[in-house]
């Protein structure tokens, strides 16, 4: 009986630990959806609230250099935001520590600059940190997911 209890405990205990991980990951994935919905709806007050108060680090998908730390404001978002709608596809979250979650996903849609609409497709990685009890964006890196390049998409890319 002792061995059955021990085996059951060894199998069950790791599940309890993993559940704590999954909770933070699910919270961040929910915040990620809220963040991009706010960006698409030009709700910059929500966007700014979901970014770190101490500033965020970013890299754009246009091939430019890394951006310096930026403390954003509603006014900055109004001035710099591209129009259009982008959607989050295949988001994955991995909790790195108690207060840091790494996220990666694809973003696709249409963006508009100076009334000119363009297709948009990029890979995104983000680090979310817990500040004052809430998950917020600390860093985001967008890298072009162009069609072609060094890897040609093939059916096996979509296999589980």
What are the residue ranges of the model-derived segments?
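Sec-dependent N-terminal signal peptides
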Residues: 4-14
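Hydrophobic pocket/interface hotspot
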Residues: 35, 46-48, 55, 70, ...
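A short gly/proline-enriched turn/hairpin at secondary-structure junctions
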Residues: 51-66, 77-82
């Amino acid at each position: 009986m002792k061995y059955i209890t021990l085996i059951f405990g060894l199998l069950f205990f790791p599940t309890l630990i993993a559940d704590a991980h999954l909770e933070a990951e699910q919270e961040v994935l929910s915040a990620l959806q809220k963040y991009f919905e706010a960006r698409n709806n030009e709700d910059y007050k929500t966007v700014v609230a979901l970014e770190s108060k101490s500033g965020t680090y970013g890299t754009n998908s246009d091939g430019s250099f890394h951006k310096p730390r930026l403390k954003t404001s509603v006014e900055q978002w109004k001035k710099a935001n591209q129009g259009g709608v982008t959607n989050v596809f295949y988001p994955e979250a991995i909790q790195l520590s108690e207060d840091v979650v790494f996220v990666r996903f694809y973003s696709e849609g249409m963006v508009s600059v100076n009334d000119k609409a363009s297709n948009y497709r990029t890979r995104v990685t983000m680090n979310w940190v817990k500040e004052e009890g809430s998950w917020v964006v600390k860093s985001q890196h967008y890298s072009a997911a162009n069609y072609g390049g060094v890897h040609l998409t093939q059916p096996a890319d979509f296999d589980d």
